[in-house]
Amino acid sequence: MTSRLRLAIIGSGEIANFHVSAAKRSGFDVVGVAARKNSETVRVFAQTHEIPQTWSDPLQLIAEEDHWDALIIAASTEAVIPLLTQAIKIGKPVLVEKPIATTSSALI
């Protein structure tokens, strides 16, 4: 028997609902979610989707990489680059849901 991949998601907005539903239908175990600091929505989101662990700091979720195998970043555009930079350093698969920047100069 093969184990299911553990997926974490950063973001708890409307589009994140679709990502979690699709991930579960595709056989992932969604094990954690993080959103902005002090966000009540992350707790409600986790309860709604039966996600066992929450983080109030997305960078902390990334740092605790032993808890997950792959990551979806569904955060606001301005938040993506710092999160993606940290996630890439770990070397695990990352799906970025939104544009990573609003200008090409922001990518450099």
Identify the residue ranges that each predicted region occupies.
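N-terminal Rossmann-like dinucleotide-binding module
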Residues: 1-49
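Beta-loop-alpha module in the N-terminal Rossmann-like domain of NAD(P)-dependent dehydrogenases
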Residues: 53-108
